[in-house]
Amino acid sequence: MPQQIEFVPQEPTRWLVPKLLVLIGVQVALSTKFAEFFDRRDAHTGVLAARLPDGSQAGVDQVGGDRWSLVETVGGYDFTGAEELWLDYVSDSGDGFDATTTIAALVARESLTLPGPRGEHFTRAGAILVLGGDQAYPFATMEEYRNRLVGPFRSTLPWTWHPRWLFAIPGNHDWYDGLASFVKQFCQGRWIGGWKTCQTRSYFALALPHNWHLWAVDVALATDIDTGQLDYFEERARALEPGAQIVLCAAKPTWTAARQDPTAHDVLEYFQRTVIGARAELRLTLAGDLHFYARYRTADGESKIVAGGGGAYLSPTHHLPTPVRPPTPELSEAVPEEQPKAFGLERVFPATGESRRLRRRIFGQIYHNRGFFVVTAAVYGLVAMAVPADRVFDRPTGRWLEAVAALLPVTLTALGLFAALYAFTAGSQASPGRKRAVAALHTILHLGVVIGVVDLLLHISGVAAADPWMRAVLGGAVGALLGPLMVAVYLWIADHWQVNSNELYAACANESYKNFLRLRVNRDGLTVYPVGVRLPVRWRFDQNLPGTAPTDSQERGEWASKPWFRPTQDIRPEIIEDPIHIPPKRPHGHPASSSSACPG
């Protein structure tokens, strides 16, 4: 592969690799603590974007003749001049090369015809690409962006006669370096192949045709919207015309966590209530972070879609709550008779049965996390040293103090192991009692194996068993072989209790069931086409690419636009469900028809 492509294709992230676990822990701790003293978004508050007078259009002639400059008006980046506009939404994309490139290749195509149960659906490439967060894994650096996002997207659309615009919001993985790399990559006017970035902040507003608006907020690490960002959107909210329709993008689908954490949705609810308020109708909310497709809908047609299938490992769909009622803390004071909306789960991809079946992959995939066996070997060796070298309860009656003293080291070690394994459940949205129960089970699984090994050694050679280093060596060897399997057994069982499900599926690193959204805005409203790919394809560098650019301008353009990689087999995109049509609501009235799936 030539060095001119300027990036190195990456394998999917293996989340249980010890070195990576340490690095992520350090990054999370530093970024969280650093954010308490300095929020990089505060620096964006003073950034003055070039603006046109209210109501004017950002066009070629108005931007100093620079064809690829986009001016931000008081209503946002202005795309209102088109009668019809297509957009693409991709989230959680920057992971393994094959999966990311598969999605990038579909987004790059000028058109897609999607087969569905009711026939085919023709779609056009988005003039705008919105990236919904987590553009690089495991954490953002310029190198990771180059290898895991820029390279794959640029290789599928190196150049085009009709360049497109790209906007992005950061997810938690983009925030792990304090947003420094994100600002460099997306807020400095860089090109990513045929896509041009133009935003100056980590959040943005797009003014779309027919009084539709796409607002994308940056909720940082702690689901927080800073005051400068609130002022930015408040200014745009005041410029809205009557009958405005809002599509809201956020990096986290907070509504899915509302049952376990009643405060999870507070920030987005506050934004909706105070910034959007009665000035506009919130019709659709988009989020990533969870790596699947899931659509929620209320009786009045408002929809919330999770579409985090841009390239990262598959997340489980079988634990999604339904219905969800995102709590509104101050609603009872403002409008006592009004109750929170109920959002019912309409469709998931993959189906819940398939999601459950895929968790069995953990028993083989656990061993693909290189170096993880070192962790289990070290733990087993330490526990084996603490296990008594004889059968404590076979000692003569009356020597109970000796028995207690013999059991003290292994007891303390077991308590330490339990504490560590309980901390391992911290990211799960389960009750503390359930977490303690599964942590105890996890501890018992490992202790049972180690005690069994020491007991076997006692049967073979009491002299060898008396040597703590001999026990440590044997325990470490068994830990390397069986320790990962015991972790896999634990993760499989814990998922049934909705604990450590994310860790289970992250360890599987399953690249199947990718997805993205294609949106069309026209006079009839907004139509969402959810695009799915059950299996990403493998890619090989195209050795037949001509190395010298032709002199003719037309031929040079065709030469520059050729993809650098070829798939080893055809990509098979499909429509996950019938297109979701959201008609516009009339000011102070009702929609012409409710949000529904349409045949195309």
Question: Where do the PLM segments sit?
Answer:
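Preference for well-ordered, secondary-structure-rich cores of eukaryotic proteins
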Residues: 187-191, 201-204, 209, 217, ...
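Conserved beta-sheet core of the metallophosphoesterase superfamily
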Residues: 168, 263-328, 481-514
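Membrane-proximal envelope and lipid/glycan-remodeling enzymes
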Residues: 245-247, 257-262, 270-271, 303-305, ...
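Active-site environment of divalent metal-dependent phosphoester hydrolases
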Residues: 96-98, 137-140, 170-179, 222-225, ...
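Active-site-proximal segments of metal-dependent phosphoesterases and phosphodiesterases across multiple
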Residues: 98, 227-229, 241-283, 366-370
